[in-house]
Structure formats: C-alpha cells, structure tokens
Amino acid sequence: MDIDHCMPVFDMAYSDDNHLPYYIQRSTHHVVRDVDYTGFICYPLQVDLNDNVEVGADIYHMKIKTMRFNVDIYNNDVATKFPGWVRFIVFCTPPVSSWVNDGCSSLFSPFVGVNSFIDPKLLKRDGHGITVLHDGIYCLCHQEHFTRSFEFNFRGPGNYTLTSDVCWSPATNVDSIYVACVASWCGDSAFMLQSDSVSWVHKRFWQRPVLEFGQCLDDLPDHDNDCG
C-alpha cells in the first residue's frame, strides 16, 4: 500500500510487519478569540503532538500530513479607528524545512523585534529552532477584515518508530504545529481560524484529545524536548 495515495481515505486502519496499526484521520475545528498588541500562540489541533506512545524501545507520534487554514481577522479598534497592522504566523517545531512545502520555509524566531510578550512563550517550548510555514504582516483599516486560506503539506511516511537513542528525524516527524497572531491595536478585535487537517494517528491516540482547540501556550507544560 502506498500511504501517500491513501490520503483521501479517512478513518482506516493500516499495519504491516514493521509498524503497529495507525489510522488516517481527518479533523476539522473552529476557534474565535480576541487579538490585540499582547498577541498569543495557540494550537490549531485538538491533540498535542508531544504526547508520545512508547512501545518497548520505540516511540510513536501522531503525524500531520496536510493542514488547511481559513483565517479571518477583524480590526475593531474603536479607541482610535485608525488603520493598524496584524502579523499572522504559522510555524512548527523542530526545524524540518526541507520536508515542508517542498522546502519553502525559513528558520528564525518570528517574534524577535516584533512582540516581546510572545518571545518567552516560544522559548519555553522549544530550544532547537523552528520552521516558519507562513509569516505575513497585513495592514487593516478600521472595521476591515483580513481573510486568507493556507495549505501546508508535510512529506514523509506515517508513524514510523523513533528508537530511544535517535532524536527527531526531520523526514518523518513534526513535533508540534502552532499559530501565532499579534496586532498593533487595542480593543475587541476578532481572530477566527478554521482548520482542516489529515493525520496519521497511532491506534493508542485514537479519539484521545489532550488539548482544547485554540488553547494558549501559557497554559501548557514545558515538555517539548523528548531527546533531552
């Protein structure tokens, strides 16, 4: 079976002589939250990709194959009613640039010099670098909407094993995916995100969400680095 061609077939089990069964799962989610100058980082998924399953000496992870975002950001800065800017970023850990969108990505902290409130949240979660999937700054007039759709494709096989003495393999693993947003204005401005993702899910992850969709990074434990 060619797993790259069974993407449209959701909720199916697959196994062979080398891998435990996993499922191909499709998930759709929706979140609305406020966005202003303080910014936020949140998960666009209902699962934490760091929640490992250990089977003997092997570690299995959930794998994202394709993720689509529909974003709508609304400038409702009633205090000034001036135009303002918003920065929307999608990134993942660890650095996997050659395996995301055919290598079209860059490695840097997206928040340096932009929003100091966010930087500690990112540094708390990952000390080995990130892969920026999208980083855009957009100007919005008062009561104007920013709407955009994005699609990210992650290459590599499914839930292949990681032995205890091997760290993250960029060919097969995305540790976690994050969405961040920060704006120049104050007030009740809205951030809306819809995500549609297709994943390989190990059978022990099946219907076992550990995070609420859109949960903020501040609320999460620091358990990113499984390899010390």
From Swiss-Prot:
It is found in: Host nucleus; Host cytoplasm. GO terms for cellular component: host cell cytoplasm; host cell nucleus. Keywords: Host cytoplasm, Host nucleus. The keyword Chaperone does not apply. InterPro entries: BNYVV_p25/p26. Its main location: host cell. Disulfide bonds: none annotated. Pfam families: Benyvirus_P25 (PF05744). Probably influences symptom severity in a synergistic fashion with P25. Belongs to the benyvirus P25 protein family. This is Protein P26. It comes from Beet necrotic yellow vein virus (isolate Japan/S) (BNYVV).
